[in-house]
């Protein structure tokens, strides 16, 4: 993932034809570059845009619709707590976060040649990750907790791990599992250690620790919690679009979604003489949920936040936003200080600062627990 503000310039020159007017041949893709602004490109042109740092929704499979998802009716705003309510419990849970687990999972996960969503590697890496999630569930002894693949039109499946609560009100924690080498998308080496292996291990470890809480494991939390591992993010938020479109169609009651995309690179920040921080994205997010996210960081992390912007369609939280669900996004730094190695063979585990990943794990765990037990959402 890399997001640049110049997408606005591109969007201004893009065709604003209604989606229903597009006719797609086998090698053409419909991209949404900004709300209501679309462009038809070849696959080569699509990846060229990504290599330039442009971000977009690939809405090719939604091109028969006369209405963009971004124009759908927005859901009612959610009111979040203005302070943490479960500090003692969460602080005790935080002690169980194990930094070694990040590396134990990330090492083999980044050893797949790539995790390209259209490839056999993408399929196998998703199956491998599903196995790891199932191991955590089995070891926890929690009843009713599941992990299921969410199938798409491409080989890689998204994964949804669900911890049922007393209601269908749902809290979503997300990260994307695919990786890409933009010099050779289908065949190039793409370890994807930071982008977004770091986000995957962040929410996976939070999932493990959350299940050690007796009330959570017994299904006694007021709200349901889901952990999403999205496929096809690099191709235009493909997996998360499919999921949140379905959730919208089924009137799923998602009260909050937090995305973790790149949580491990700090050298850009420290080399610039800035304090290590958690980046809080402020565009294309829910303002109230973002304020609550800062409350969580203040309470449960030991480093500060820094506000930043990432542009349109920069990660999977944008899919939640598009379908009317409140979403927030925590990032490894301010935009511009993030890893320069992503989308290449150099995005390796050696570039990941696991102490920083641990900070994101703390905020993920706090966010999940506080909202799981928020009975006024």
UniProtKB/Swiss-Prot annotation:
Catalytic activity, EC: 3.4.11.-
Annotated disulfide bonds: 310-314
Control of this protein's activity: Calcium, magnesium and manganese cations reduce peptidase activity to 20.3-51.3 percent. The metal ion chelating reagent EDTA almost completely inhibits activity. The protease inhibitor bacitracin and the aminopeptidase B inhibitor bestatin, as well as DTT and beta-mercaptoethanol act also as lap A inhibitorsD.
CDD domains: M28_AAP (cd03879)
Cofactors that this protein relies on: Zn(2+)
Signal peptide per UniProt: 1-18
Thermal dependence: Optimum temperature is 60 degrees Celsius.
Annotated GO biological process: proteolysis
Protein purpose: Extracellular aminopeptidase that allows assimilation of proteinaceous substrates.
Stated pH dependence: Optimum pH is 8.5.
Keywords (A to Z) from UniProt: Aminopeptidase, Disulfide bond, Glycoprotein, Hydrolase, Metal-binding, Protease, Secreted, Signal, Zinc, Zymogen
TM region(s), chain numbering: none
Residues the record lists as binding Zn(2+) 1: 176, 195, 261
Name of the protein in question: Leucine aminopeptidase A
SUPFAM superfamilies in the record: Zn-dependent exopeptidases
């Amino acid at each position: 993932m890399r997001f640049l503000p110049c997408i606005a310039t591109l969007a201004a020159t893009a065709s604003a034809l209604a989606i229903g007017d597009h006719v797609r041949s086998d090698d053409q893709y419909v991209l949404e570059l900004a709300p209501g602004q679309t462009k038809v490109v070849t696959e080569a042109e699509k990846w060229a845009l990504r290599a330039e740092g442009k971000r977009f929704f690939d809405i090719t499979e939604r091109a028969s619709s006369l209405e963009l998802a971004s124009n759908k009716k927005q859901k009612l705003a959610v009111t979040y707590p203005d302070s943490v309510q479960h500090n003692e419990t969460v602080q005790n849970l935080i002690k169980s976060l194990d930094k070694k687990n990040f590396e134990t999972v990330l090492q083999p996960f980044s050893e797949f040649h790539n995790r390209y969503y259209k490839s056999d590697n993408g399929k196998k890496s998703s199956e491998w990750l599903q196995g790891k999630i199932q191991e955590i569930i089995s070891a926890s002894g929690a009843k009713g907790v599941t992990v299921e693949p969410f199938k798409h039109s491409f080989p890689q499946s998204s994964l949804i791990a669900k911890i049922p609560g007393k209601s269908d009100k749902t809290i979503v924690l997300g990260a994307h599992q695919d990786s890409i080498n933009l010099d050779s998308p289908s065949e190039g080496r793409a370890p994807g250690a930071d982008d977004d292996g770091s986000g995957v291990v962040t929410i996976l470890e939070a999932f493990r620790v959350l299940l050690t809480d007796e009330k959570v494991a017994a299904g006694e939390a007021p709200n349901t919690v889901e952990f999403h591992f999205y496929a096809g993010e690099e191709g235009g938020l493909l997996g998360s679009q499919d999921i949140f479109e379905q959730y919208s169609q089924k009137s799923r009651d998602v009260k909050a979604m937090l995305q973790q995309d790149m949580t491990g690179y700090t050298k850009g920040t420290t080399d610039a003489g800035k304090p290590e921080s958690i980046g809080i994205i402020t565009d294309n997010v829910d303002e109230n949920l973002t304020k609550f996210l800062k409350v969580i960081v203040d309470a449960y992390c030991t480093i500060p936040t820094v506000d930043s912007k990432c542009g349109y369609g920069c990660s999977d939280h944008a899919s939640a936003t598009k379908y009317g669900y409140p979403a927030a996004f925590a990032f490894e730094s301010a935009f511009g200080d993030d890893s320069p190695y992503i989308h290449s063979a150099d995005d390796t585990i050696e570039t990941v600062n696991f102490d920083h990943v641990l900070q994101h794990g703390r905020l993920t765990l706090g966010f999940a627990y506080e909202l799981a037990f928020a009975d006024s959402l």
